[in-house]
Amino acid sequence: MIRYALLRSGRRTLQTRPSPQTLEELARLKSLEDVDSSVIRKLINQRTEEVNAQNEAQMLKKLSAEGRDLQNVPGSRYARPLWLLLIGCASVYLVRDWLRMKAEYDARETTLETRVEGLEAELKYLLEPKPGVLEVEVVQTEVASSAPWYKRWLWSGSR
């Protein structure tokens, strides 16, 4: 490419310096002495920006892929159904246990009710008035009432 250069005297002179457009063209040159340093700097910066943009794009792709991988954890789609199953099983177990305990309580209650009824019947039988026995007990209590209370309590069976 042809360039015009200003000399110190202020005249324009025709200058023929090679001006490569890419780094590959710059690499094909035999010598870098004829190439302006600003052109070299511009080409290097341009290529560096391209490489940085490619690296950044690859890094963004990698980060988005990692984000998708974290979201697509194999167990995550089964977590909610497993929690629901766990809660359902726990509920069934609690209801079953409550029904079993209620049945045991009812069975124990019926056995105790029959035992209480039997004891009440026995108590009624024992408390029924018996003519011969009551007269003897009444006589004994009248005789025993003349003694002090502590003698009746402590020595009632020894006489």
From Swiss-Prot:
Membrane topology, record value: Single-pass membrane protein
Coiled-coil zones: 102-124
Cell compartment(s), UniProt: Mitochondrion inner membrane
Keyword Coiled coil: yes
Residue stretches spanning the membrane: 78-95
Residues on Mitochondrial matrix side: 19-77
Record's keyword terms, sorted: Chaperone, Coiled coil, Membrane, Mitochondrion, Mitochondrion inner membrane, Transit peptide, Transmembrane, Transmembrane helix
GO process terms (BP): mitochondrial proton-transporting ATP synthase complex assembly
Transit peptide: first to last position: 1-18
Cystine pairings recorded for this chain: none
A cellular component term, taken from the record's GO annotations: INA complex
Mitochondrial intermembrane-facing ranges: 96-159
Family: Belongs to the INA17 family.
Free-text function comment from the UniProt entry: Component of the INA complex (INAC) that promotes the biogenesis of mitochondrial F(1)F(0)-ATP synthase. INAC facilitates the assembly of the peripheral stalk and promotes the assembly of the catalytic F(1)-domain with the membrane-embedded F(0)-domain.
Quaternary state and interactors: Component of the inner membrane assembly (INA) complex, composed of INA17 and INA22. Interacts with a subset of F(1)F(0)-ATP synthase subunits of the F(1)-domain and the peripheral stalk.
Protein name: Inner membrane assembly complex subunit 17
Encoding gene, per UniProt annotation: INA17
